[in-house]
Regions:
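Acidic, Ser/Thr
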Residues: 510-518, 598-606, 732, 820-822, ...
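Extracellular glycan-recognition/adhesion modules and their associated mucin-like linkers
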Residues: 805-824, 839-865, 882-908, 926-930
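Asp-box/WD-like beta-propeller blade repeats and closely related beta-sheet repeat scaffolds
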Residues: 125-128, 132-149, 153-178
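Extracytoplasmic
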Residues: 502-507, 538, 552-554, 559, ...
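Beta-propeller domain segments
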Residues: 30, 93-95, 103-105, 117-118, ...
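Proline-centered linker/hinge motifs at extracellular inter-domain junctions
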Residues: 487-491, 575-578
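Solvent-exposed loop segments of extracellular immunoglobulin-like
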Residues: 517-524, 608-616
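Secretory targeting and sorting signals
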Residues: 1-27
Length: 930
């Protein structure tokens, strides 16, 4: 959900973005030195792909992984697998939330929310059809009992509640669990809807042959459906449940579900209940439109909601303030025509034929805090992607004897998290519920996945890490203790030269990275998990017996405080090696293209590799997180990357290909390659020197890279440029102008291509410059854009495109853009035709420029701008009728007419005329460029 906004947008915070009736208090001065971040578990072996946490009364933590693994980490940092559930794991499904029963001290009951396997087919559900029964599944809330040793008692399982699920199609199936002071269970559920064919607006596709997963009216806006909701129930001793009084719909109300406490949510991935007040705090992810469209609806924004009583929060009809500017239009996906705005104030009308609930919905409530979109973000929130995680409210207990409990000054603060932006913000809540001061919390990590306060008043944080659907070395569980200037415990860091192999297995252990906050000398103690130990800082150990060993390093400071770290060693089985032969890491791709893949797996213990157990998954990368879209099993195969119809054309999106294999001994290895889009915003650089992002309304994504001086640079990785023949950059200059250069390896590496940037007449006046590329290495590395020129400011860079030459342009039904009969006369018809590899289908595409075949240009007849004006072949003349711009949604737009290249009548027959038409984002306007 990333959209970068100009600084002016943030200035609208108090006036437009917060629902506040009183002036906010001053932010509390949180001294980082008063808090200690303790690493409890880290890495895939200890947290897997981390999903959710719940703290037990003894301050140990239960945490889930999507693959069905439930782990427990005690206060000393010892982690064990306590249970494993069989789960359905297509797209985002798997094991999600975990909750601890308020009576755990006596009943030892916990709750898990997950996707049971059922008999769902493998692979993707079709986008169109008539029978969806095979893909109808559930996400399930079940209750379990933990044994005395904290292992999961599978025989105790009681299924409490099923939530419908449309399987084989992404997204929004998460669920979070919490309890109020009365023991009522709250469960948040996503809308279970696909956002990738709605142009970043509301997914309300009512075409009768469409997969129901494209219509969120059947779920979030359906009063008779449990998706897109916050549910509130009271679970009975036997596992059945009752509905407490005061939910949104009274029991017995026709066409409603009494379990619904609040409705109208898109992806309420994290929520918590403040037990002192019963108020629910919730983060709801929003869609990704980069700009408001009067015919569709508002630009994408996200919300933190403060739910004080039952209500409707509007999705998929209303968002943010629910004013007209932030309300969606009715939209006919079949015809691409707009309708009236939904009535958020009076209550939207759900007319979808898939709606089984009330037609007239309750009035929509505004967000407590909404950010991004046209309103910008609170200045304290900074910039980046939008991924709100609803954390806990801290309640100070003066009578609690705990040396690590948080201070009274944070009493009543809501701890908001941001996965993509990577922050934790304590927010003061006024007596009237208004938003007060927003403070910064001193955490060091990657992506906030979940948070919870423990019984001792410490804060626990689950860090997703930097992987895509697999966890990585940065995935972790942390505890934050408040020490108020006291001596802080040391941090232990443990690593091993190898973590798996056959006996005898010699492992070199290292304590490198261990430290003491006060700088004291540390002593070390290693427990090798087999009854032996060592006091050396970096010992070596040989294991002779097969098994899995949990190795613990304890670091001790001069005052006797300790920190621990763990490493898992598997003897008797070696983790498989998974190599992706293709696609190459860093190679370029186009949305809509079919990408062949090849995987080689080797494993010392598996005599032969079962290719049916090898899986390649396509993940749509999006800033620092991703959406798992589809997968294929096999050592070879192909995956078609769908045209992205959700994110703004200037969004930081890319493709991740994840190959995985689990060997016969249960060890899994993932290998990932990142594929890059041909067109990229300059401000999405990985590293840079000397430059600044600058907000500009004329820029494609609202920002450029500016303040460029001689010798400055920006860098992107990974990139493989061996097939790149030229580049085009969108630039402006009110300064000296200069030269833009492409290099690899380093900012001073060999220049592969360059383009002269002229003075354009102003910093807001953009033009395209093009350079030829040659000599690129046939390897993956870092791409550098370096800047050269005279003294002072040179130019700004908005975006750049890497061009790979000529090839077919593939459109509707997999057919090609074709010059009729291969003719070269001016006026020759441009048509859709079965792809045949002839010169009549070999197009050279210049970004924001001409599209050429047979030595002539794709032309709008007569320079016309009206709907239905035919496309033809014509002598290249540099006119606006021959200028074409590729959009991220797959459309090819003619800027002069502001219309898109379109297959007339949406008819895939050979010979169908190509013309221009209003840009609708429909299938007959989507093209895969070479």
């Amino acid at each position: 959900m990333p959209r970068f906004r100009c600084a002016a947008g943030a200035a609208l915070l108090i006036a437009a973005s917060l629902v506040a009736t009183a002036a906010p208090a001053q932010a509390h001065d949180i001294n980082p030195a008063d808090f200690q971040q303790v690493t409890l578990a880290k890495g895939v072996a200890e947290v897997g792909e981390p999903m959710a946490i719940a703290v037990l009364p003894d301050s140990s933590v239960l945490h889930t992984a999507r693959n069905g693994t439930l782990r427990r980490t005690d206060r000393n940092g010892t982690t064990t697998v306590v249970g494993t559930l069989a789960v359905y794991s297509h797209d985002e499904e798997g094991l999600q939330g975990v909750g601890v029963d308020p009576g755990f001290a006596t009943n030892r009951q916990i709750y898990l929310y997950y996707a049971p396997p059922l008999s769902t087919p493998a692979g993707d559900a079709p986008s169109t059809g008539s029978d969806w029964s095979a893909w109808t599944g559930v996400n399930r809330l079940s209750r379990y009992t933990l044994n005395a040793d904290f292992t999961l008692n599978t025989a105790s399982k009681v299924d409490v509640l099923d939530v419908p699920a449309a399987r084989g199609l992404c997204c929004h199936v998460g669920g979070d669990i919490d309890f109020d002071a009365a023991g009522n269970l709250y469960l948040s559920t996503g809308d279970d809807s696909n956002p990738f064919d709605s142009a970043g607006y509301s997914p309300i596709d009512e075409r009768t042959n469409r997969n129901p997963g494209y219509d969120a009216q059947r779920s979030a806006a359906n009063t008779n459906d449990l998706r897109g909701k916050v549910l509130r129930i009271k679970v009975n001793a036997n596992g059945t449940y009752s509905v407490p009084a005061g939910n949104l719909f009274a029991p017995g109300t026709a066409n409603t579900r009494p379990e619904i406490y609040a409705m109208g949510f898109r992806n309420p991935f994290r929520m918590s209940v403040d037990k002192a007040t019963g108020v629910v705090y919730l983060g709801d992810y929003g869609p990704d439109a980069g700009a408001t469209d009067p015919n569709r609806g508002p630009s994408g924004q996200v919300e933190f909601n403060r739910i004080t009583s039952p209500g409707n929060y509007g999705w998929p009809y209303c968002t943010g303030t629910n004013t007209s500017a932030e309300t969606y239009n009715e939209w006919n996906f079949a015809t691409g025509t707009t309708g009236p705005k939904f009535d958020c104030a009076g209550g939207p009308t759900n007319n979808s034929f898939r709606n089984t609930g009330l037609t007239k919905l309750p009035p929509a409530r505004p967000a407590w805090i909404r950010y991004a979109g046209d309103a910008g973000s609170p200045p304290e929130f900074g910039g980046g992607s939008e991924s709100p995680m609803g954390g806990p409210v801290y309640r100070y207990d003066a009578g609690l004897a705990s040396p690590t409990k948080f201070p009274q000054l944070l009493d009543g603060h809501f701890f908001a998290g941001e996965l993509g932006r990577g922050w934790i913000k304590p927010i003061h809540v006024g007596a009237d519920g208004s938003v007060g001061a927003i403070s910064s919390f001193p955490w060091v990590g990657k992506q906030v996945m979940d948070m919870a306060f423990g019984p001792e008043g410490s804060l626990y944080v689950l860090d997703y890490g930097t992987g895509y659907f697999n966890g990585d070395a940065n995935s972790a569980l942390y505890r934050f203790d408040y020490l108020a200037g006291s001596n802080r415990a040391p941090t232990a860091a443990a690593s091993a030269s190898t973590t798996s192999g056959q006996a005898p297995l010699t492992v070199a252990f290292s304590s490198a990275g261990s430290s003491d906050p006060e700088g004291g000398a540390l002593t070390y103690s290693w427990n090798f998990g087999d009854g032996t130990s060592s006091s050396a800082a970096n010992p070596s150990k040989t294991y002779t017996a097969n098994g899995t060993y949990s190795v613990t390093l304890t670091a001790r400071d001069p005052e006797g405080l300790t920190g621990t770290a763990n490493v898992a060693i598997t003897v008797g089985n070696t983790a498989p090696t998974v190599k992706i032969n293709s696609p190459f890491n860093g190679s370029l791709f186009s949305y809509g293209a079919t990408i062949p893949f090849s995987i080689t797996v080797t494993d010392p213990e598996d005599a032969s590799i079962n290719c049916a157990a090898v899986k390649m998954t396509y993940v749509l990368g999006h800033d620092s997180h991703g959406h798992q879209i589809t997968s294929q099993n096999g050592c070879t195969g192909s995956i078609t990357i769908p045209v992205d119809g959700e994110h703004d054309s200037a969004a930081n999106i890319f493709a991740v290909f994840d190959a995985e294999y689990t060997d016969s001994g249960g060890l899994t290895t993932h290998t990932q390659h990142t594929l890059q889009p041909r067109h990229r915003q300059a401000e999405h650089f990985k590293t840079a020197s000397g430059v600044d992002p600058i907000g500009k309304t004329q820029a494609e994504g609202g920002e450029t890279v500016g303040n460029i001086n001689n010798g400055d640079w920006i860098a992107f990785e990974p990139y493989r440029l061996s097939n790149v023949t030229s580049f085009t950059a969108r630039v402006s200059s009110g300064g000296a102008g200069g030269t833009l250069q492409l290099r690899t390896g380093s900012p001073t590496g060999t220049v592969l291509g360059s383009a002269t940037v002229p003075v354009t007449g102003g910093w807001e006046t953009f033009t395209d410059v093009t350079g030829t590329v040659s000599g690129a290495p046939a390897s993956t590395g870092t791409l550098y854009l370096t800047f050269a020129g005279g003294a002072g400011a040179l130019f700004d860079v908005d975006a750049f495109t890497l061009n790979t030459g000529a090839g077919p342009i593939v459109g509707l039904a997999g057919k090609c853009l074709d010059v009729a009969g291969g003719g070269t006369a001016n006026g020759t018809k441009i048509q859709l035709y079965t792809c045949n590899g002839t010169a009549a289908q070999n197009w050279t595409v210049t970004p924001n420029g001409p599209v050429k075949a047979l030595g002539k240009c794709l032309d709008v007849a007569g320079g016309g701008t009206a709907n239905g004006t035919k496309a033809q072949l014509y002598t290249c003349n540099g006119s606006g009728a021959q200028t074409w711009a590729a959009n991220a949604d797959g459309s090819l737009r003619n800027p002069q007419s502001a219309r898109c290249l379109d297959v007339s009548g949406n008819n895939p027959a050979d010979g169908q005329q190509i013309h221009i038409w209003d840009c609708l984002g429909a299938a007959n306007q989507k093209w895969v460029l070479p």
